Amino acid sequence: MNNSGKYLIWTLLSVIGAFALGYIALNRGEQINALWIVVAAVCVYLIAYRFYGLYIAKTVLGVDPTRMTPAVRHNDGLDYVPTDKKVLFGHHFAAIAGAGPLVGPVLAAQMGYLPGMIWILAGVVLAGAVQDFMVLFVSTRRDGRSLGELVKEEMGPTAGVLALVACFMIMVIILAVLAMIVVKALTHSPWGTYTVAFTIPLAIFMGIYIRYLRPGRIGEVSVIGLVMLVFAIISGGWVAESPTWAPWFDYTGVQLTWILVGYGFVAAVLPVWLLLAPRDYLSTFLKIGTIVGLAIGILIMRPTLTMPALTKFVDGTGPVWSGNLFPFLFITIACGAVSGFHALISSGTTPKMLANEGQACFIGYGGMLMESFVAIMALVAACIIDPGVYFAMNSPMAVLAPAGTTDVVASAAQVVSGWGFSITPDTLHQIASEVGEQSIISRAGGAPTLAVGMAYILHGSLGGLMDVSFWYHFAILFEALFILTAVDAGTRAARFMLQDLLGVISPGLKKTSSLPANLLATALCVLAWGYFLHQGVVDPLGGINTLWPLFGIANQMLAGMALMLCAVVLFKMKRQRYAWVALLPTSWLLICTLTAGWQKSFSPDTKVGFLAIANKFQAMIDSGSIPPQYTESQLAQLVFNNRLDAGLTIFFMIVVVVLALFSIKTALAALKEDKPTAKETPYQAMPADAQTITAQAKRAH
């Protein structure tokens, strides 16, 4: 195609995207078709990748396809493996796409679809994809080192240790929140619990099958795995209806917490080939297939967005989460726009599989755009269901039905209708019956809400194939595998971080080949995130109300730290005139996270500030005037949880400010130098047989 044809295509895409965005923005008081959001998003992603992504690659970073990558230099068939770019894109996407893009947009829908949509699109183009791409580039130029090691190398040992401690603490919070979403989705859900539990022996069987029974037969084991997944969902319905079997899979939140802690420990110490690898394989199939199916379903059904563009809760008084649109919308959406967790994947893991530096934009920038598209579809799925149902599902039980309420559903319908979102008890009963659950009231965490939206889209787009309950539990399985994959991998990664830290005290604890050291570090990791998980599960306000803001703040602060590193590297490369590419999102993230952190810690508003909330409940205990919706032990739990969250938030704020000072100091020192001071691996040209090596690796995959 000649240049004029290409220009015509990009011009047409720009016009279509601008028209779609304009239609969405100018539509006031009328319900619009969800297809407008999907079209606008796709146009934005394509234009951003073609122009901004490639500008960063060619002009800002000076990506060099002739430069040897760590995967080619150290090709050992284990950690360093040059991988075909399409295969690596799948690996990278599976690793970064966890619960964030699924849950964050669902929670953000409390304020309407418009604010969330704008930030998801603007945030990913200017911040999220930029971070993923630049960190991948920086790590690739330094032999695939991890984020903490990169900070240590470029900013000094003190900053490096501080970054490592912060990374570990943030990882613990992330894992606790991820696990809590699974717990909230599976509590008193025999169908969902059975289906997810079924995947554990299935994954182990697949691992043994491919390693010992039929080595190399990937096709066979894939068919077996997919067939058994469908059987797990169908048989889950039989289990849920059985008075004998249902109680075996009907657990409280606390029981599921301890089950997940035990599972997390076992999964982290078992050989990777036995459980994690086959589960990841199953998860990748399910992720990609479901995302594609959901996108096609939206195109076929063209559902109407029933949630308003802006709700009354933009003033910060919402029941799902508290706080004003700025800064709390930005930390609530989290991974759908920008995620610090991705920096841990883009450094240390993906760089060791990158076959050519020229593919970093496709993997890093493109992979994050794909995750953002998942977030857009999650937002659509949440906004097509009745707003009354949305708020009944996501509001805390203490708000919907105070302690002692006999008819919880009637109470919830009355409370939600009082907010201006009319809903009847019959409607809530009907939806619970259609999805095969005992109740949908206060199923906080976002995952059940997303599952309801997905179920109706998939059921409708396939012409009523299977009933809604099948698709609801299919969506729950999809979300649980999405999340448990991240919990498995995250626990293992956190164990490596902790062993690095423990190695400072005792060098023997750093050895990953030592079984006692591995078991000790793994136990400490699962107990750490298990503790926060338990605190969230027993929280009378649902846990998500307090833990998700902490997760959002910590995760976005980690992104800010990663982008600070990228800005420092640009200064040390003598490319400071382009440092704005990293400094622009860094500045916004620091403003948002520090503002949110300060408000969550010290705001006198008893719906926002952790300490204010703790003091309010402590005063109730001291005076003996305990509201009917709480018990004294519940109030004591809330006091402790909020004080702990405040302490952690203050710690993360101090860390990010200190690292910002180290960044400024390092950048100023770099400006005084006449030559580049970035500590890159010396240049080596790509070998002549690089393509052959990659092709061999592709066949091995």
What are these regions (language model features)?
Residues 154-172, 366-373, 444-446, 465-475, ...:
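Loop-to-transmembrane helix boundary motifs in multi-pass membrane proteins
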Residues 31-50, 54, 108-138, 148, ...:
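Extracellular loop-to-transmembrane helix junctions
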Residues 35-42, 47, 53-60, 166, ...:
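Membrane-interface loop-to-helix entry segments
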Residues 18-31, 102, 114, 172-188, ...:
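Transmembrane helix-loop junctions in multi-pass membrane proteins
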Residues 54-81, 107, 117, 121, ...:
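Flexible loop linkers connecting adjacent transmembrane helices
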Residues 1-14, 47-102, 284, 324, ...:
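Membrane-interface "cap" regions at the ends of multi-pass membrane proteins
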Residues 22-28, 33, 79-142, 153-157, ...:
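Membrane-interface helix-loop-helix modules in multi-pass membrane proteins
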Residues 298-314, 369-453, 489, 534-539:
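Extracellular/periplasmic helix-exit of transmembrane alpha-helices
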